Curated annotation (Swiss-Prot):
Protein name: Nuclear hormone receptor unc-55
Encoding gene, per UniProt annotation: unc-55
Organism: Caenorhabditis elegans
One of the record's GO cellular component terms: RNA polymerase II transcription regulator complex
Disulfide bonding pattern of the chain: none
Main localisation: nucleus
Family: Belongs to the nuclear hormone receptor family.
Pfam family of the protein (one): Hormone_recep
Gene3D superfamilies reported in the protein's UniProt record: Erythroid Transcription Factor GATA-1, subunit A, Retinoid X Receptor
UniProt-listed GO biological process terms: cell differentiation; cell fate specification; intracellular receptor signaling pathway; negative regulation of inflammatory response; negative regulation of transcription by RNA polymerase II; neuron remodeling; positive regulation of transcription by RNA polymerase II
NR C4-type zinc-finger residues: 21-41, 57-76
Single GO term (MF): nuclear receptor activity
């Protein structure tokens, strides 16, 4: 365990410059084509896109792209530019800007309580898990509609997740940070949902948000009356989940709740979800795998310390269950009204490189609706 403490100590000590180039890590000269980039990568991307240039990789299409090697493979450099979110239109669309602003602002009261109890410190060798998540004062809600509440919960959760993840990954290169966040976002959101009061009556909530998601995708949420012909020809919106899929989703949520994870187990599991990724595009894959192993060792020791050796296997079972949710259509379910047609990956990328406000709640938990 001593090795785990020393090996992970550097994770929370230093943070890369927020204006580093997202492609090669060199000093950024500003935001170009939608992302912070250096003059070299900006010019390379501009030239490649405007001239519609086509490149070939002489290796395995997985070349390292950093300050020293960025000129060695144009194919991999352009691929990384695109993967990191550089776009030929150069600026975020109005819809994307609106979505990001909405997520950043949130619409829940700023006094919303945290998921964690007061003065709870996590015993872990990782500095980013040793920060207390101080709850805010309990808020009095004005009985919003069910779907309004769950959309607000979704917006607050995505914002809290990105800011927590930014701290957790602060010593990794930005490209890996974005890959990890995109890869783990769905299981982390499902985990937050399972631990919220929405999970107690998920059928009602999903019926509301499914109808909203379907109408948004079919353009029926726009204002204005429809002609008689339009109303007759309008088809019933397709449900995001059919009945068997919904039952499977509900069963997974119920099973996650049945594990009754405590605050240390929950935080450790969330961190393992964030860093568990087998994408070949990761630049620091060995370092990330080492973090996962140390996290698992810390959880194992915590279970043994509490004389519950079988608990570790139960937590691993919960981990696999959460990983199995990775392909669920949560973007369509919970973010359709907030994001419109903007991909959730774009919002995650933009939030990750945007400096956080001074004070944030962690994972929100709405009060029970009686």
């Amino acid at each position: 365990m001593q090795d785990g403490s020393s090996g992970a100590a550097s994770l929370g000590n230093s943070s890369p410059d927020a204006t580093d180039c997202v492609v090669c890590g060199d000093k950024s000269s500003g935001k170009h084509y939608g992302q912070f980039s250096c003059e070299g990568c900006k010019s390379f991307f501009k030239r490649s896109i405007r001239r519609s240039l086509s490149y070939t990789c002489r290796a395995t299409k997985n070349c390292a792209i950093d300050v020293q090697h960025r000129n060695q493979c144009q194919y991999c450099r352009l691929t990384k530019c695109i993967r990191m979110g550089m776009r030929k239109e150069g600026r975020r669309s109005n819809e994307t800007q609106t979505a990001v602003s909405a997520v950043q602002r949130g619409r829940l009261p700023v006094t919303m309580p945290s998921l964690f109890p007061p003065n709870m410190f996590l015993r872990s060798p990782f500095p980013f898990m040793s920060v207390p998540f101080n709850p805010l004062m309990t808020a009095q809600f004005t009985k919003p509609s069910i779907k309004e509440s769950i959309f607000e919960f979704a917006a607050q959760t995505i914002f809290a997740t990105v800011n927590w993840a930014r701290t957790s990954m602060s010593n990794l290169v930005k490209g890996d940070q974005l890959i990890l966040l995109r890869h783990s976002w769905t299981p982390i959101f499902i985990f937050a949902l399972a631990q919220s009061n929405f999970a107690l009556n998920l059928s009602t909530h999903l019926t509301a948000v499914t109808a909203t998601a379907a109408s948004t995708e079919n353009g029926s949420s726009s204002l204005g009356s429809k002609s008689e012909d339009e109303e007759k020809s309008e088809e019933k919106p397709e449900r995001v989940f059919d009945e068997p899929q919904f039952q499977g989703f509900q069963a997974k949520i119920d099973k996650i709740r049945d594990f009754h994870l405590d605050v240390v187990e929950s935080s450790s599991l969330r961190a393992v979800l964030l860093f568990s990724c087998d994408e070949e595009a990761l630049e620091e894959k060995g370092k990330i795998e080492e973090i996962v192993e140390k996290l698992k060792s810390a959880v194992d020791e915590y279970c043994k310390m509490n004389k519950r050796s079988e608990r570790y296997h139960q937590i691993c079972e919960c981990l696999q269950l959460l990983k199995s949710t990775r392909n669920l259509p949560i973007s369509r379910l919970f973010f359709s009204r907030l994001l419109g047609t903007t991909p959730l990956e774009t919002i995650l990328s933009d939030l990750l490189i945007t400096p956080p406000p001074p004070t944030l709640p962690f994972f929100p938990q709405l009060p029970s609706r009686n």
